[in-house]
Amino acid sequence: PLLQALAEQLGPWTVNGPVRHVAQSALRDRQQQRQQRERLLAASQRLEELLRRHGWPPAGGSALFQRLVDPRCAALHDYLARRGILTRQFEQPASLRLGLPADEAAWARLDAALLGFKEPAHA
């Protein structure tokens, strides 16, 4: 009964003490928030430009990802996955969501993979 009551109070997404401390500090640090927003927006713009350069103009996105809407998205999803680049695939409409690469090595891998992608043969 006690554990059940506690679980009902806390809910399924509890946050431990150290994480709460870090989160509270981050929420108070306005300069860090501004810098993080600027960094994310710059990275998102970089991703948009990279995709456009390879013939994949984004159909929208946010500071955290870019979205592609194209009939070839399923093939691109599989191709990137085989190269260790994970994307989020949607079927209707055929689309992909690509998150921001984590570091320069990941940016280079994505660039090389997009360069090597060949459109699937049509039946």
What residues fall within each predicted segment?
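PLP-dependent aminotransferase class I/II
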Residues: 1-51, 56-57
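Residues that cap or initiate secondary-structure elements
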Residues: 2, 72-74, 104
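A short, ordered amphipathic alpha-helix with a cationic face
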Residues: 11-12, 82-85
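Residues at alpha-helix caps and immediate loop-helix transition turns in enzyme cores, especially N-
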Residues: 19, 32, 72, 106-110
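Conserved PLP-binding catalytic core of the aspartate aminotransferase-like
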Residues: 41, 48-83, 96, 100
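Short, flexible turn/loop "capping" segments at secondary-structure junctions
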Residues: 58-59, 89-91
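PLP-dependent enzyme catalytic core of the Aspartate aminotransferase-like
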Residues: 79-83, 90-123
